[in-house]
């Protein structure tokens, strides 16, 4: 009887499935058909940001701390390809938020217990003329959070500040 919310923003069913899809890409060999076969397609994958060459330059341009030779060879190929270079930034997640515990204590605001579980995944894929030249992934494979709010006065807890503020 307590509220639940499910947030799905990925075609992948799990973090490992998303990781496997990105790890399966072979730089300098995998092409658009491989990406589509693995379920990686900006037109089908929600929350995919298509990056222009200028976006990629802003992310990887060498700075005082990072020299050109420190960059991955695939990134260098992409930067040198100029307008032939495109990138996809993929963000996916499956998050379940549920209030658990005693219905009466929750309803009367004495105690609320919220559990958040799931995963978050992000990946960056760079392509030159439709061929993958670089891929990287990261994220949170397992989210498990518990939040407990206790109000000793229950529904009366918020009345005190309301009375003080009206004077």
Language-model segment annotations:
Residues 1-167:
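Residues within mature, well-folded domains
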